[in-house]
Amino acid sequence: TPLYSSAASDVYKRQVFIGTSYYFYTVLSKQNIKKSTANGGVVSEDEGRLQLRYYWFNYSKSGVFDCHVNNEIKNKHFKYTFTGRNLGESRTKLGANNLYTGKFKFPVQDDNNEVAISVSSNVPQPLNIISGGWEGLYIRRNSAV
């Protein structure tokens, strides 16, 4: 069936978002420290405790998205929303549908074995996460002799 749309005003030479709104949700894999082996391979360093402090996502021309930090063992659930608005920017106007490029950093403050980090969005604006990373504290419990 054909899709028809109309606009309440003239949209000539204006940016317009057209598309279907859908729910995006993904859970990231467990974060580990990687170490190179003598034969050129890579293994996870899991002999200690990795305390994740912060996580961040680099985004490009992106709209609103949510970052979830969930720990089912401790029953802790936090949601951090990137609103697409940065205070102090001159482009931040009410009613404007701007896209932003930058870095969104949020706290985790949990053990890497217990926490699950996920990203979700259900807005019609584009979601374009190009990379991510984390800061943490690693304490090795034992060492080879």
Report residues per predicted region.
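Single conserved hydrophobic/aromatic residue that forms the stacking wall/gate
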Residues: 1-8, 12
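Beta-sandwich interaction modules
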Residues: 9-10, 86-128, 132-135
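Hydrophobic, well-ordered secondary-structure elements that form the walls
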Residues: 18, 55, 117
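Exposed low-complexity, polar/acidic, P/S/T/G-rich flexible segments that act as propeptides
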Residues: 23-67, 122-145
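Short, intrinsically disordered, low-complexity segments enriched in Ser/Thr and Pro
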Residues: 45-59, 76-107
